[in-house]
Amino acid sequence: MKRLWVIGCGLWLSCMLSHALVPIEKPTLSEPTGIAPAYFGPNAFPVVEMLDGRTSSTLDVELAGEGYIGYHSNNTVNLFARVHVPLFTRWANITLWMPVYGWYDQYDGKGSGAGDVYISTDIQILHNEWFKTPKAKYIPQMTVRAALKTASGEQFDRRRHYDCPGYFFDLSMGQSIPLKQVTLRLAGSAGFLCWQTDNGRQNDAVMYGLQAALRHEYVSLQATWGGYFGWEQYGDRPMTVKARVAGHVKGFEPYIQYQYGIKDYPFHQLRVGLIYHIAILKNRNTPSNPNNEQ
């Protein structure tokens, strides 16, 4: 019994000493953390690809290769994957994406590692098909999205990924305008984004985006401008523009995309990928077009 008492006292003392050696400091909000996209690799927390006001009625499986040329000798090559899954209806999706693995060459040498996993729930909250009036075609489509970023990305010590979770919510709205042989799609989005930084702090940001797309039966063109405003104002306000060309043949969608970092995202990006649309909701009031063009 005496031996157990001595062991218990020893464990209690070691716990007290271990806690005493870990200082808990009050956050200094006036000092920026530097945990921001301008000072990390291209996959740390990039500008999120915006929705265009619609969810998907198909199971979409995407695989791509992408390269980043840094403005300051920071070059990266990634394998990228994404999947959209309808939740038994075209009006709600689960989306999962990540840079599966990347190889990089930066100022302090070469390396490689896995990236962060993102998962989102995308819900249609407004659609013109829900209204049976002659002017229903003028009603825009709207979606809300809630997403989580994991802390699975590797090599925080070499400034490749944040060693912390994050999340964002956004609202997107879009409208299709039929022209002679093409459809013009205009969309906008706004939201809130947050990620943990250090010493119990977090960075909050306002998201924004505008998009214009032209869709023909076999090809589509898309241009997007977007970014977010972090509150620290220290490398945390990335702004980018993207141009995308895609083909559409029997459920397959090969594409090529270029992205240019205007501010706080010092990279050129080139992505080449393929999306396969699988109709898994047949005979459930889904459109025949796999990309839901209205």
Predicted regions and their residues:
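Transmembrane beta-barrel domains of Gram-negative outer membranes and organellar outer membranes
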Residues: 20-150, 157, 164-172, 218-231, ...
